[in-house]
Structure formats: structure tokens, C-alpha cells
Amino acid sequence: MKMLDKTLPLEELESSLTKTESKAYYLSKLVYRHDKVVNNKAHILQRKLLNLKKQLFYGLTSYQKLCVARHKRRPTTLDYIEYLLDSWIELHGDRRGSDDPAIITGIGRIGRRSVVVLGQQKGRNTKENVLRNFGMSSPGGYRKALRVMEHANKFKLPILTFIDTPGALAGVSAEKSGQAEAIATNLKKMFSFEVPIISTIIGEGGSGGALGICIGNYVMMFENSIYTVATPEACSSILWKDSTKAADAAEALKVRAEDLLTLKIIDEIIPEPFGVAHDYPLLMVRILKNKIRDQLDFFDTFSPSELKHHRYLKFRKLGLYYDC
């Protein structure tokens, strides 16, 4: 089997592999119990295809990682909540007349623990994306998230946040409603909470929109997620007045998990099964659940004041710089 030509568009390569993988699976089912030789060959083909998939998603450029993070089949916050929690109830509204569908909030249980969960939610299709503002939260969304987090702090419940947004909602209505103030208030309040906050970047982590719910004691990031001060397209338009330079901007912004771990912006990279979460969502959930449980166990030993101080010190030490 030939090596992959990574000069081709990522979507084209993945589509070709997926079609071949489906044909191999169909072939193995078709000949099952009828022709062992052909059946064995089909299994060999499937293994080779799996290796090619690993190869495809290994060593991606920053912009290719961005494409994977935006994949239409990539699991969303709701997908993870549904399978991570043994039971949960969604909570609505910011108590100021708004209930932003771009942010999901709720309370549930992982094993014997009660937890509060929240995260940005993208749609699966155009209609859903319009409803959820493509995962871009309004000021009401951040206030809803804050209301639920304050509930968690009051009742001493751990907070789990999931980040997947290109950024906060930009527009006249959002600015009139106090977008900057809503995000700033979240940042301030999250530093004051005396419960563990575990944040996971599952897709796009864009700008202040991501940071507004990402002040965590522990910040994890999926292998093919991105975390950035601005989208590469926006950055290239601002710096070079040319949106076609988005790939160059992505490299300069250091959006990849590997770069961010080196720069000490995040605490851990969560590997995606066989290189990609959207083809193996249930396996991805199991991996994430174990990681979250480990961190909940770790922070169980901290007192409320220690949790608050730990978060403060973490962000005081954030980042890495070099003297020129």
C-alpha cells in the first residue's frame, strides 16, 4: 500500500481513506464464514488502512490541526456530557432574560461525585449552527455559565468546562449587551472559586471566547484541538490584510497542543484514538473520563483555600518567554 501524499488537501485524503475503509468492512462481512482466505485478506486490509489513518493524522501542520478541530463530525460538548455523566440535568437561563443556546450548562454525576458541567456547543448542520451561533457565546451565555458556576461554588461541586468556540459572538448586539464585561467578570469570579475547575479544550479554543470559561486548576487539550488568541484567518487579515495567509498565521500563533504544552499554557495533551476523535467517539469519551477522574481524585486532597491559591499561582506563572 502506497504512502499518503500529504500535499493533497486533508479532507480529500480522509474521504478517500474512509470510503476504502467502509468497502473493506463491507467485504469482510460479505465473505464472513464463506471464504476464510478472503476474510483474512480483508482484515489485513483493514489493519493497513488503520495504519494509514494514523499516518494521516501524525505530524499535521498547525492549519491542518485547525481543519481537524473544525471537522463537521467532531464530537461536541453535548456528546461528551451525555456519555461522561451517569446522569445529568441541563440548566437554563442567566436570570436576566437570556438563555444562550451556544453554551450548555448543567449538573450531573460521575460515579459518586456530583459535578457542574458547561461548555460551548456547535451545531451539526447549518440550521443547528445558526441556532447556536456556531458555538460563539453572547454575553448572556457567559452570564448563564457564571450563574451555574456560582451555584457549584456555593454547594462545593467540582466544575468541568469544555471549550469549543472560534471566539465570543462579535456584533453590535453583543457589544451593546456588554460582551467584554461579561467575559471579564467570568475571569475575575473564576479566580475566586474554592472548588476544583477542570477545563478541556475539545475543538477550537478561540480568543477571549474560550478563556471566558477556561480559568481552570488543570487545563487539558485534545491532540487535534487548537487554542489561540485569534483565529488564523482573523490574524492574517489584521497583520497582512490577506486572509489567504491563514496557514502562516497558524504557525506563528503556535495553536497546536504540542506548542502550547512546551510554552506551559496547558497542562496535558489528551491523545486521540488512532489520531482522530471523530471516528472513535466512544473510545475518546473513555479516555477523557479517566483523565477527569484522575484530576478529581488529585484535587480532592486540596482545601478550598488551596484550590483558589493553586489556580492563582498557575496563571501567574503562565507562559514561557525568551530574552533576545
Swiss-Prot record:
One of its GO terms (biological process) is malonyl-CoA biosynthetic process. It holds the Pfam family ACCA. One of its GO terms (molecular function) is carboxyl- or carbamoyltransferase activity. One of its GO terms (cellular component) is chloroplast. Keywords: ATP-binding, Chloroplast, Fatty acid biosynthesis, Fatty acid metabolism, Lipid biosynthesis, Lipid metabolism, Nucleotide-binding, Plastid, Transferase. Residues 44-298 form the CoA carboxyltransferase C-terminal domain. Pathway: Lipid metabolism; malonyl-CoA biosynthesis; malonyl-CoA from acetyl-CoA: step 1/1. InterPro entries: Acetyl_CoA_COase_a_su (IPR001095), ClpP/crotonase-like_dom_sf (IPR029045), COA_CT_C (IPR011763). This is Acetyl-coenzyme A carboxylase carboxyl transferase subunit alpha. It comes from Cyanidium caldarium. The gene is accA.
